[in-house]
């Protein structure tokens, strides 16, 4: 019911109203495009990155991650793919999970969306999460408990990426993340119809009013959001970001992908 009452409100207004859930999600339409949005208070909730299991095998599916968390008495309140990867699902850029680095920071321009600089890093630290432009991240020496690099940046210090064209006909399903200046407010978005980079970035800057935002990926993008009765199936993913909460032993079966 809350979703109907909040329909059409900026998520920053709608979801900072004392809701008990670890993550709040809603579907909305902005400037003619449809999106699913999930917002997290990083100062209160547990965000994690997932790539490999204890044997070093890529997990790659929401259901596989759920199986791992079940042993901890935890479950996914939300999850989505989080950064670009090679065909073997290894990260293209910086990847750190719980203090262990698998891949170094990549600072040079290159091919594809990842190399469309400026790109950036999604950095998880105690009580906060930040999107930081790659060269600024390198210069700052920021130590992240977990981090994933992707690109391009969507919003840099309140400005759209300089290469984005308003009338571009390059339209795909896209997902990404934006963060507030204090690192508390984190909003994940996935489009429900194909959008160009300009439209997607404008969602974060103009509607969500977030000063930093980072693109995660395109047509492979998937979302696990029990709030929306949604858990997308598909090919194996690389890095995944999720919000973790205690498993309720009285609840029904978890959505499977």
Residues covered by each model-derived region:
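Short, solvent-exposed aromatic-acidic interface loops
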Residues: 52-56, 136-140, 190-194
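Bacterial N-terminal signal peptides
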Residues: 7-15
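Positively charged n-region of N-terminal signal peptides that target proteins for export
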Residues: 1-4
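Zymogen propeptides
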Residues: 19-113
């Amino acid at each position: 019911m809350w979703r109907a009452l909040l329909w059409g409100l900026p998520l920053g207004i709608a979801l900072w109203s004392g809701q008990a859930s670890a993550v709040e999600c809603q579907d909305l339409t902005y400037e003619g495009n449809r999106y699913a949005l999930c917002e997290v208070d990083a100062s209160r909730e547990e965000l994690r990155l997932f790539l490999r299991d204890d044997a070093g095998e890529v997990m790659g599916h929401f259901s596989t991650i759920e199986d791992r968390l079940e042993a901890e008495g935890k479950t996914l309140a939300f999850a989505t793919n989080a950064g670009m990867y090679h065909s073997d699902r290894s990260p293209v850029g910086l990847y750190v999970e719980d203090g262990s680095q698998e891949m170094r920071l990549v600072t040079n321009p290159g091919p594809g969306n990842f190399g469309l600089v400026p790109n950036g890093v999604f950095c998880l630290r105690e009580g906060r999460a930040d999107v930081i432009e790659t060269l600024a991240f390198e210069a700052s020496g920021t130590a992240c408990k977990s981090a994933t690099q992707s690109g391009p940046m969507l919003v840099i210090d309140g400005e759209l990426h300089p290469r984005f064209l308003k009338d571009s006909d390059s339209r795909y399903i896209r997902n990404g993340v934006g963060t507030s200046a204090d690192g508390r407010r984190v909003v994940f978005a996935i489009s429900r119809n194909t959008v160009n980079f300009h439209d997607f970035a404008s969602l974060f800057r103009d509607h969500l009013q977030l000063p930093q935002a980072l693109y995660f990926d395109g047509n492979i993008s998937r979302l696990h959001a029990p709030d929306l009765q949604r858990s997308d199936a598909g090919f194996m993913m690389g890095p995944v970001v999720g919000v973790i909460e205690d498993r309720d032993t009285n609840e029904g079966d978890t959505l499977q992908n």
